[in-house]
Amino acid sequence: MTISKTFCIYPWMHQMIDTNGAVKLCCVAEDPTLPNRFGDVKSEGQAMHVDQTSLSNAWNSEYMISVRERMVTGKQVMDCGQCYRKEREGQSSFRLRANKDWKEKVKQVEQYYKIFNDEYNTADQPTKNRMDMSKHYVEDLPEYLDIRFGNLCNLKCRMCTGIYSKKLGEELKEISNKDPEFKKIAQSSAEIYNFDWYDNEDFWQELEKYLPHVRLLYLTGGEPTLVEGNYTFLRGLIDKGYAKNISLVFNTNVTNFQQRFLDTVNHFDRVTFNLSIDGVGGVQEYIRYPSKWKAVQQNMSKLMDKINATNQDKTLEYLLKYDPQFLDIQTANQLLNTQTSKDNNASGTQFRLVFTPTVNVINVGSFDELVNWAYQFSEDNKSNKVNWDMEPIMLQGPQFQDMAWANKEYKKYALQKLKNIEPKAFELFTSLHPFVNKMKIALS
């Protein structure tokens, strides 16, 4: 089997629970609980929500079986429209990125269907009938979970909606109550959802089945450092001994770092902070209102201090295991050198700090300034425990903020400014060059 033009690896190894409890294909997919979204998918209109179905039942529901079948045969899935639109416009999509990031899993799926088809072609009809029923059933539970325990957030970003920001949701609800016309055009943005769906013992018992399989966990919000559900979940993983086998990824707006957050994530194998910083100075403050640029810079420095301090505490803890009466200066130095060598070889938690600006019509003209600031900060804060990168994201919505809507003069200006990016930034940020090339195409 050769993967089709609509194939995405996620339905074979990834499951997402949105802030309102909806079980979705991924973070940019449409919400399956919306009616009439599935075209000819078999489970049209069927709710996919943790209040109405278990995670494991959702994993191999009629909907998921149909999605896998369509993707394997090259048919489009209605809920994947954002990726198709990006690809039509010549931009990178989550589908393409997922297939690239998980290329080994893609090969495994290809191999599965090759073996299946070979066996199917030589089987008798009764066997074929049984095989037809199980062809797109995935027995293994997903190794990648994206869970969002509510929408608590301290910002009201320009591109966001109430489902991901409690403050913005409250503001939109207030506006819609005063203006019926606004409610008509922004119904989903102003709607109040149930964000306490995880306060349910059945859900936690169901999630327990997944934990031995999970290798990657993506948590955001809202702002993940504020969401209590994240702390509850992570502490449970630590107490049950799963943390050492799991890599964590967080999106954070860099406005709120707490010591307990660093203390918690330090138990996990690898931790990636996706730093949602969209510009320098006023650009950042305008897009991610009401953040303050000075505070963002200070918090970045605090984050580095806390990461380094955590590693120093580990080294001290390592030394204190030895009886002080037998620990002379020479022996202590030898032990420190040994532990430092281990740290340099990825002993303990490894941190990855990734600048993830959302590129849109507002900040595309100052993208070079953000890259150069990020490069300089990274250079000034080198650490053997931290890997730096920049992975910009093309805006997924709302469409009117897409840089494609910029006029010719502004596009020309933004294209010219890309030449100001520090050349060494492309060496440090290995993901930057392909993205800038795509930007140039989009702006031309």
Where are the predicted features?
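Glycine-centered loop/turn positions within well-structured domains
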Residues: 24, 155, 282
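C-type cytochrome heme c attachment motif
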Residues: 81-82, 155-159
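Distinct, well-ordered alpha-helical segments
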Residues: 231-235, 258-265, 366-370
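Conserved C-terminal portion of the radical SAM core fold
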Residues: 14-25, 249, 268-274, 294-444
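Accessory C-terminal segments flanking Radical SAM cores
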Residues: 1-120, 141, 392-444
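Core AdoMet radical
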Residues: 140-152, 163-199, 212-228, 240-259, ...
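Non-catalytic membrane-proximal stalk/linker segments that position and tether the catalytic domains
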Residues: 78-140, 173-203, 209
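Detector for the c-type heme attachment site
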Residues: 84-86, 160-166
